[in-house]
């Protein structure tokens, strides 16, 4: 099916969105949001090249710990995202009588097609902290099947706070898109207006508005997946610590990337990282099962593996000028490491990083050297200024133990 045919099918069955009379936002283009955003690596470090954020998202597309900082606002300014500046920067001049923009995706499964309408909101201003975050992705999914020479909608699935709810389409309405009611602030989608049970009640009272269909654009999926659809980070800053409340403690950082998943809080992941809704729309609609583990299950397993294998003992490491032993130049050093740990926690190699202390107080990296416990190696490390080194031991699973503090090479024997 060509892109034009996909858009035609998406337009025909596009949902009619009904918004609460007090709703301030409509789903919009991602471009305006990314144009004013920086990308953070973890909680603080700003990745280079931002804003705009899109280039950094492509470069760091596998960084699960990254998060968008909309408009570069201060991490502690919880009220900033409600300010006039953010509204104007995002393009608040949008027509609130309309239904905004939806990003479409068509997934063929047998003789049926699953039409996905991804809706992006720049803000999720819930009352309680666990639900308060920047950036918000919502999904409306419609299954259409061939009927004679055309198509007919047979079921609709809405992601109500991530939990899919599927309803069949009445026979009299199979040739059109469904009506969807959007809750104020949370933007969760429902089949009926009124109050709906949630952490706090979700409410949608359109006050007699007839609703409207969103404009449509296909999700910009690149062949090499270097796009914001597949970016592994989160679409906003943690405002309320919702993930920590739900999942619990985070262990020490390790080379296992899954131990850092969800660290940015409860802001959403990109569409391609939202589990079975992307991976298997049929399963998301309740038509089957998927055997792949969920992100949370993988994270918990990684935590257990990390806790069971993390080498808590620092190895004994010595660095001394090689001239003590063989009379070679002072820029050649012997590195010797002792054994540490046991079983899976046993240190299998030691990595030593060397730095040159410059006159202005900064340091210049000179590279890494590796040695095995119980062995010694001789390495050439040219330098002019004072030499500083630090070391850390790694086990067989490449998990790093407690690092050895910064030290200087032992004095040369007289």
Go through the PLM ranges and name each one:
Residues 351-355:
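Beta-strand signatures of extracellular beta-sandwich domains
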Residues 399-414:
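Short beta-strand elements
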Residues 1-136, 148-318:
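A domain-level signal for the mature, folded cores of soluble proteins
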Residues 360-369, 400:
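Surface-exposed loop/edge segments in extracytoplasmic proteins
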Residues 375-379:
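Short strand-edge motifs at loop-to-beta-strand transitions and within beta-strands
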Residues 385-396:
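Beta-strand-rich modules
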Residues 340-349:
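A short beta-turn/strand-edge loop motif at beta-sheet boundaries
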Residues 311-328, 338-340:
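Short, compositionally biased P/S/T/A/G/V-rich stretches that sit at domain boundaries
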């Amino acid at each position: 099916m060509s892109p034009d045919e996909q858009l035609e099918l998406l337009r025909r069955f596009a949902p009619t969105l009904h918004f609460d009379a007090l709703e301030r936002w409509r789903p919009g283009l991602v471009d305006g949001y990314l144009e004013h955003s920086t990308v953070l690596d973890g909680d603080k470090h700003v990745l280079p090249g931002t804003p705009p954020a899109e280039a950094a998202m492509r470069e760091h597309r596998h960084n699960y710990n990254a998060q968008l900082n909309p408009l570069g606002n201060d991490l502690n300014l919880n009220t900033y995202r409600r300010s006039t500046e953010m509204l104007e920067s995002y393009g608040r001049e949008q027509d609130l009588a309309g239904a905004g923009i939806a990003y479409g995706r068509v997934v063929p499964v047998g003789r049926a097609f699953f039409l996905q309408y991804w809706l992006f909101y720049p803000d999720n201003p819930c009352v309680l902290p666990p639900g308060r975050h920047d950036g918000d992705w919502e999904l409306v999914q419609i299954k259409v099947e061939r009927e004679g020479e055309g198509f007919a909608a047979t079921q609709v699935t809405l992601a109500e706070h991530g939990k899919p709810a599927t309803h069949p389409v009445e026979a009299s309405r199979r040739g059109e898109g469904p009506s969807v009611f959007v809750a104020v602030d949370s933007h969760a989608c429902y089949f009926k207006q009124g109050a709906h049970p949630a952490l706090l009640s979700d409410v949608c009272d359109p006050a007699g508005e007839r609703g409207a269909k969103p404009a449509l654009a296909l999700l910009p999926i690149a062949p090499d997946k270097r796009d914001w659809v597949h970016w592994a980070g989160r679409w906003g800053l943690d405002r309320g610590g919702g993930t920590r409340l739900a999942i619990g403690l985070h262990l020490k950082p390790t080379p296992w990337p899954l131990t850092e998943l969800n660290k940015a809080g409860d802001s959403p992941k990109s569409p391609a990282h939202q589990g079975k809704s992307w991976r298997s729309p049929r399963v998301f609609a309740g038509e089957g099962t998927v055997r792949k583990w969920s992100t949370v299950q993988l994270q918990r397993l990684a935590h257990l593996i990390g806790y069971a294998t993390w080498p808590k003992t620092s190895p004994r490491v010595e660095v001394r000028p090689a001239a003590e032993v063989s009379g070679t130049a002072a820029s050649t050093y012997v590195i010797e490491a002792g054994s540490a740990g046991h079983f899976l926690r046993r240190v299998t190699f030691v990595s030593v990083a060397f730095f040159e202390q410059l006159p202005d107080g900064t340091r210049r990296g000179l590279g890494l050297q590796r040695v095995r416990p119980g062995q010694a190696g001789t390495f050439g490390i040219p330098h002019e200024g004072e030499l500083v080194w630090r070391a850390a031991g790694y086990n067989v699973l490449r998990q790093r133990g407690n690092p050895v503090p910064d030290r200087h090479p032992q004095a040369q024997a007289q």
